[in-house]
């Protein structure tokens, strides 16, 4: 595994898996599954706050886990299986000599994948870029359910995607259409100003 980042780098806060996804983990690698389930926060309810009402829907089955904890679990499992892991190693091209002799190359280099661009004629990707803006935050306020909170402002709607991922932390993603983001002047706001605006909304 060649990873462009350092071993314990992470971006964002927590990630979410459905019960169905966890079931796939259990089939593919029971050891990783057991470690993940020892470290996650599970819930069945989804709370939606819209126009002053709270609507709760149950039986969904999701779990949240910290991104860094998940990376640590997967790195430890790979090491236990004898997988060579090279960190701070950028692979810019599948013709990189470090990949010579590989039976399979999996390039997980994000939405702007250079490998996908290189082989676009073969893969025929269908990429649909949208214009929503979001801010991925974390808070120590704990929520009992996966929460969607919609708030209307003078220029349009904001929504928050909220989920607890450990005993003390919740992911709090704030999203809005780009037109609303621009109308509120958030394109000129720094991080602190953006967070203060979200707190006020």
Predicted regions and their residues:
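Extended, Lys/Arg-enriched charged tracts that mediate electrostatic binding to polyanionic substrates
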Residues: 138-143
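Conserved N-terminal helical subregion
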Residues: 19-136
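Glycine-rich FAD pyrophosphate-binding loop
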Residues: 1-12
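Adenylate-forming
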Residues: 135-137, 172-173
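Intrinsically disordered, low-complexity boundary segments flanking structured domains
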Residues: 1-3, 34-36, 52, 120-125, ...
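A secondary-structure boundary/capping signal
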Residues: 2-4, 87, 107, 177
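Conserved FAD/dinucleotide-binding core of flavoprotein oxidoreductases
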Residues: 55-60, 66, 81, 144-201
């Amino acid at each position: 595994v060649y990873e462009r980042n350092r071993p314990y780098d992470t971006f964002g806060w927590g990630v979410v898996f459905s019960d169905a996804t966890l079931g796939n983990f259990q089939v593919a690698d029971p050891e990783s599954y057991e470690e993940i389930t020892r470290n996650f926060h599970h819930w069945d309810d989804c709370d939606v706050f819209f126009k002053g009402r709270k609507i709760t829907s149950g039986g969904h089955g999701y779990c949240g886990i910290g991104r860094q904890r998940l990376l640590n679990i997967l790195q430890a499992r790979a090491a236990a299986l004898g997988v060579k892991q090279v960190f701070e190693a950028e692979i810019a091209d599948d013709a990189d000599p470090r990949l010579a002799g590989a039976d399979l190359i999996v390039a997980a280099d994000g939405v702007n994948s250079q490998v996908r661009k290189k082989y676009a004629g073969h893969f025929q990707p269908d990429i649909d870029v949208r214009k929503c803006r979001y801010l991925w935050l974390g808070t120590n306020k704990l929520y009992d359910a996966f929460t969607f909170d919609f708030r209307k402002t003078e220029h349009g709607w904001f929504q928050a995607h909220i989920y607890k991922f450990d005993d003390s932390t919740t992911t709090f993603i704030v999203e809005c259409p780009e037109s609303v983001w621009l109308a509120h002047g958030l394109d000129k706001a720094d991080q602190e100003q953006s967070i203060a605006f979200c707190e006020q909304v």
